């Protein structure tokens, strides 16, 4: 959720999810496509699944996308004095090729993520300050941490080199029926184990020091996922890719990708809240019956419609979606896994730099401040941000004032804001349930809830970010397509990596 310099974790250059292109059709002869598909949720997962379902099933299927709030879901913006700023998913890695492809095919433009120098604060002083000189940063890191930053680079690179396999599988139209099977196909038991072990446990076994974990790793976890090193090791590795120096965003806000995908898929948007999904009791006839009835509310009116396939692309936590499943035998599992509250606050003000450093404010050059694990600060991070339409990064300060973004667990009080800023003109906040609470061992919710009922957001319990949601959307579309057409040989295949190497 922010741009963090690569030097915070040493030589973490060029890390990311390496993605392949999209590929061939399944070999089995497809039957007639379904008539109607419902997708619940118009975030990146829901709209990307609509996009890929259209590509797989063709032009004749009707796709309804339900959204009770705004298109984009947690890719939301906040307005400060007439300008929009990212409040949710903010940055995209240069090798997130799903997102890059969307931007290219939809005719959108990219902008560099907000840059600047970063510091790490322990509640008393800055334990690390980034320099504009690369060699100075290297000396600082080696002096304080030895070669642990280089070893961290190698650890993350090894994990993500394996993760790239999922994109080769998807480029050949292979799908997976569970998150665990997807993870196993990528890297075997060692990869699945990442979900069941904390990042701290993993890195301590690898020989990383407490000082390095507290000052270099925990701050990145806190700003990206609101937790420390107690989250699972896989989401920890994904989080570390935010140390890349070439992060970008979509001009106009990342949420415009969702509206673009919705339009490109020729889907029908229904602005309403889905109340229940019921398995129908329709008797079998010559044509496949509509298997599910979706009951939804628009304004004060309640409606319903029938669908062949339903994809749920919204968290099924009761505090977030509150969808009731009726007439399923066995019953659909309950989804009680908690999501974390995150409060995004945008403040236009003059930073109280003496809170972090004894230097005069004119000599305080940091644009972002992260906090260590043992800090008693009431925020997770603080950074200067640019509006979604500003191509050149944050504009120069006016009367010493910038627009700053903070992440915190609780709503900031006026006293807390006044502690952070010498003065401020404006503050706007958005509290929301932003991502799962990671508590390994991590069991991911099922993807297949019923014969033609699919759940995308279980992948968030492996890691939550835009690209993971796009991967989940593509996987769900492939899974629905293959199961509709009986292409069992395209689902959960063993030894795919070796098989595809042989094909090449």
Swiss-Prot record:
It comes from the Eukaryota. It comes from Rattus norvegicus (Rat). The gene is Pcyox1. PANTHER family: FARNESYLCYSTEINE LYASE, PRENYLCYSTEINE OXIDASE 1. This is Prenylcysteine oxidase 1. It catalyses: an S-polyprenyl-L-cysteine + O2 + H2O = a polyprenal + L-cysteine + H2O2; S-(2E,6E)-farnesyl-L-cysteine + O2 + H2O = (2E,6E)-farnesal + L-cysteine + H2O2; [(2E,6E,10E)-geranylgeranyl]-L-cysteine + O2 + H2O = (2E,6E,10E)-geranylgeranial + L-cysteine + H2O2. Its cofactor is FAD. One of its GO terms (molecular function) is farnesylcysteine lyase activity. Transmembrane segments: none annotated.
